[in-house]
Amino acid sequence: PEADKNALARRVALDLTGLPPTPEETEAFISDSTSGAYQRYVQLQLNKPAFGEHWARMWLDLARYADSAGYADDPLRTIWGFRDYVISSFNENKPFDQFTIEQIAGDLLPNPTTEQLVATAFHRNTKTNSEGGTSDEEFRNEAVVDRVNTTMSVWMGTTMACAQCHTHKYDPITQEEYFKVFAIFN
């Protein structure tokens, strides 16, 4: 059976913003019997800042965003600009190809804007360690491995971790291909 307008209002708001609609929004939608009421209600939800915040959260999980370094001393990082870039990109309905280019190579665009430079913080969303006794070269290498694996899983929908050690006859990516991608991010 078709959902009633009250349930529909709730489902749309929760799906698009992660938040329930206000009582006023629900009442306005229920009482609007004109053509296009549903489309207007959807647009109302899409125009809320909560839309970008809700959908950016899922992208930020994929991008391994965190406000901390991820280790025992766990100092705060100043990476919130990347979070805000992702939220505004969703709220502005930025085309996905542009969103992708800016995160992978925004700094390589001709005359990059501050926003495009901030977008490349996608590559900085990796664990950082400032503890004494760590090997800078080893840690740099681990960060490159993390960038390769994350970039491939986010944009290609496949993991490359196995190819880091060996070529497997059932995996689509060989060890040689893994290290070619590694060389790009190194």
Predicted regions and their residues:
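Short, structured secondary-structure elements
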Residues: 1-186
